[in-house]
């Protein structure tokens, strides 16, 4: 076997076993060995002696993507422009799965920076299908997910309550990756039709006061990274990009993150991206929502910068609860909780919905403080407005099936 053929067989083996190779990097205790392993991957798929003519259907690693990976392997963070180019090449289908996995793994090993988030978000925003709403000053409650606590879908319930309180909402979201239920899962379980065109979503927002921006339908370029994300089964930078890439360009955001460090990173990125106003919250350094146990860390984003504060259940005027009071096994259970709360059920599930809906209303400048936002959220539930809006959303979307 000639040298070129031998190297091509090495490449095919790496491509066929890319998942195993990349995942094996995480078992290493040495950052040096991680870098060495990834260098081997890069050499095998893009080494100077490799003849791409042996496999003409395979796109050659682009200069920007290769440079980005090599910079990360040396422990350096990427500029906004370089990250923008690298993610753009991935989302334009100009990279292989092994190359994508190499970039995502290198980012994860070193930890994503603010500039990297900003550059990636800009590339993703440019390729998103926009929602042509007439309504302005929209709110989004999309969080990062991935807290693995298996609570019911609090952020989606909070979006419905905020909309029932009069705040227009463009809820961005997807199906579950690591939790029991994602926003798409629970809305589908409630009976909402997710398969709407961008014009229908805009009409839903303008008419009902809330619409769901189903990420796979509006971020078509993500299809190139999706198989790699699924095979890796770990958190990557794409988990952080959902809250930064609302297709309706929401002016206000309530963003949940499962770690305080991630919350601060997102807050700084939102500020750099020019977000009008956002609250980025992390409950007790484990929940990607406002929590009613421990302390919720809140990063307030405005044009002036980012400020940090903390909330507790007692400061919100609500009873504390345990995570066990909020856990579900599937989307059907999550939907049942929302229906029960909207029908008047009291207890921890209602309280945490009130807390998060109040935070959403505060983020949208509908209240002066979290304490004054609490009764607004509670009234939207207690008067039956949340239940009626939920049924209207279901009916409206089904009529456009």
Show which residues each predicted segment covers:
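N-terminal glycine-rich anion-binding loops that anchor highly charged ligand groups
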Residues: 62-64, 70-116, 126-133, 352-353
């Amino acid at each position: 076997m000639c040298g070129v053929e031998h190297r091509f067989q090495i490449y095919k083996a790496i491509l066929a076993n890319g998942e195993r190779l990349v995942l094996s990097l995480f078992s290493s205790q040495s950052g040096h060995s991680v870098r060495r392993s990834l260098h081997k991957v890069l050499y095998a798929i893009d080494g100077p002696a490799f003849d791409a003519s042996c496999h003409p259907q395979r796109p050659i690693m682009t200069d920007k993507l290769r440079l980005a990976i090599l910079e990360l392997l040396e422990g350096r963070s990427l500029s906004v422009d370089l990250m923008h180019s690298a993610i753009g090449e991935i989302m334009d289908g100009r990279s292989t799965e092994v190359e994508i996995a190499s970039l995502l793994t290198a980012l994860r090993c070193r930890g994503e920076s603010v500039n990297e988030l900003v550059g990636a978000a800009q590339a993703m925003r440019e390729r998103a299908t926009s929602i042509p709403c007439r309504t302005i000053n929209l709110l989004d409650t999309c969080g990062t997910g991935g807290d693995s606590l298996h609570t019911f879908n609090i952020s989606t319930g909070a979006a419905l309550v905020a909309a029932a309180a009069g705040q227009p909402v463009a809820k961005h979201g997807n199906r579950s990756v690591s939790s029991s239920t994602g926003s798409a899962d629970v809305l589908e379980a409630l009976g909402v039709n997710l398969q709407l065109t961008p014009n229908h979503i805009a009409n839903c927002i303008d008419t009902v006061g809330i619409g769901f921006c189903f990420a796979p339908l509006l971020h078509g370029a993500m299809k190139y990274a999706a198989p790699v994300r699924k095979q890796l089964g770990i958190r990557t930078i794409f988990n952080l990009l959902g809250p930064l890439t609302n297709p309706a360009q929401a002016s206000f955001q309530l963003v949940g993150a499962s770690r305080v460090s991630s919350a601060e990173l997102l807050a700084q990125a939102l500020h750099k991206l020019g977000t009008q106003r956002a609250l980025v919250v992390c409950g007790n350094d484990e929940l990607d929502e406002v929590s009613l146990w421990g302390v919720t860390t809140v990063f307030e984003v405005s044009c002036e910068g980012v400020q940090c504060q903390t909330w507790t259940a007692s400061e919100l005027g609500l009873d504390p609860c345990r995570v066990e009071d909020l856990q579900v096994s599937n989307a059907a259970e999550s939907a049942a909780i929302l229906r029960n709360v909207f029908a008047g059920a009291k207890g921890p599930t209602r309280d945490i919905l009130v807390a998060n809906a109040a935070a959403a209303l505060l983020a949208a400048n509908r209240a002066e403080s979290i304490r004054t936002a609490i009764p607004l959220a509670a009234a939207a539930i207690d008067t039956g407005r949340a239940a009626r809006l939920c049924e209207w959303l279901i009916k409206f979307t089904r009529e456009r099936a």
